[in-house]
């Protein structure tokens, strides 16, 4: 006789909620839309992580890198060391504690400060680009100063995240009241293999790249070791961190477009490559041979953003959901259509992309810039 099936209703490995919205005209708006979308998907999280990334929020300091730094357990020795480190390696034009609402429903929040800085390169480091210099210094803080973590490091943008439901984190950082941006991404976390702690909440960020992720990256070990060869080190105890560093390496440092990066993360199966025409077969074989360590295995969906553009993509067989919608200049990506319709009921278009195919939204100014670059190449 077969045994009785045991159902564990509290064991759910298919959760996490993702949302992203960009106004392609560049119009800035508050975080309320992203907050309400995440409230609609509250059942996708369990209160152990929520967060937002916002772009265009610091126009008065838009030419400076905005470092959001988290000090675990309010470690003032760590803060003192970070202050000294930044003074030695950057020109700090302004620094302050990030304003918060102490009445918000969050547990044991750490200390958050923001620093607006420009690089102060010396010696051989003068050979580095400003971006490479900032990445190097962020890695030094995250790996060498205990209890200090740089959670975002781009210009005119910031990440706000922590332990709680997304609406709790939004209330804590006062995102609806204090900030306006032209693009927002958001995440509701349901941790499965890693702890629910403030640094492990999404988004993950390096420079202005941010990633929110639903799923499980079973190739994390291989991805992590490959990225370490290029100076990227994972310190935040979750697999998603590799995605932020991978897009920085591939798109910023190596100059690959989203369309090719999507095929590195989610390439065609070998049996599909075998039946392609010769040109495509050579192309995809070269991608898989050269970038095999950055193939992302497992069930996953990600929304990636940087200044001027955002894209969402799933694994090649869509084991985690993503849906997109458009209304005028607004482009949405989300784990659920219901979240999009909760904030924009009258959509012009709704569609679900194929597995491994990116949904891309760009500022109109960015589209014109890319078109000009393409015409110059041709």
Swiss-Prot record:
Keyword terms = Glutamine amidotransferase
Q: PROSITE patterns from the entry?
A: GATASE_TYPE_2
Q: Name one Pfam family in it.
A: GATase_2
Name of this protein: Uncharacterized protein AF_0952
Q: Which residues form the signal peptide?
A: none
Membrane-spanning residues: none
Report the residue ranges that make up the Glutamine amidotransferase type-2 domain in this protein. 16-378
Q: Which residues form the active site?
A: 16 (for gatase activity)
Is Iron-sulfur there in the keyword field?
A: no
Record's InterPro entries? GATase_2_dom, Glu_synth_lsu_1, Ntn_hydrolases_N
């Amino acid at each position: 006789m077969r045994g009785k099936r045991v159902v564990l209703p509290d064991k759910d490995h298919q959760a996490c909620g993702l949302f992203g919205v960009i106004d392609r005209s560049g119009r800035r708006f508050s975080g309320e839309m992203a907050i309400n979308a995440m409230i609609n998907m509250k059942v996708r999280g369990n209160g152990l992580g929520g967060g937002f990334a916002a772009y265009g929020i610091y126009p008065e300091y838009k030419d400076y890198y905005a470092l959001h730094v988290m000090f675990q357990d309010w470690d003032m020795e760590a803060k003192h060391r970070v202050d000294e480190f930044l003074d030695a390696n950057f020109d700090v034009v302004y620094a302050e504690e990030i304003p918060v609402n102490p009445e918000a429903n969050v547990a044991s929040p750490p200390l958050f400060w923001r620093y607006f800085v420009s690089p102060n390169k010396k010696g051989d480091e003068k050979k580095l680009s400003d971006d490479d210099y900032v990445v190097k210094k962020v890695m030094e803080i995250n790996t060498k100063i205990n209890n200090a973590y740089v959670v975002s490091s781009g210009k005119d943008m910031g990440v706000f995240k922590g332990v709680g439901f997304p609406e709790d984190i939004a209330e804590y950082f006062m995102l609806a009241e204090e900030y306006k941006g032209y693009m927002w991404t958001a995440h509701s976390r349901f941790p499965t293999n890693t702890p629910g702690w403030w640094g492990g909440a999404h988004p993950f960020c390096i420079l202005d790249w941010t990633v929110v992720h639903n799923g499980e990256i079973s190739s994390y070990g291989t991805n992590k070791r490959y990225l370490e060869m290029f100076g990227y080190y994972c310190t935040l105890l979750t697999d998603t961190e590799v995605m932020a560093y991978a897009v920085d390496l591939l798109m910023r440092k190596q100059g690959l477009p989203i369309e090719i990066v999507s095929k590195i993360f989610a390439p065609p199966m070998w049996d599909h490559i075998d039946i392609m025409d010769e040109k495509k077969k050579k192309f995809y074989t070269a991608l898989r041979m050269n970038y095999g360590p950055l193939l992302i295995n497992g069930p996953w969906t990600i929304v990636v953003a940087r200044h001027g553009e955002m894209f969402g993509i799933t694994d090649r067989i869509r084991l985690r959901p993503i849906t997109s919608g458009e209304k005028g200049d607004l482009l949405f990506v989300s784990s659920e259509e219901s979240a999009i319709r909760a904030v924009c009921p009258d959509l012009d278009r709704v569609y679900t992309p194929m597995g491994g195919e990116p949904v891309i939204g760009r500022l109109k100014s960015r589209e014109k810039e890319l078109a000009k670059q393409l015409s110059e190449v041709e």
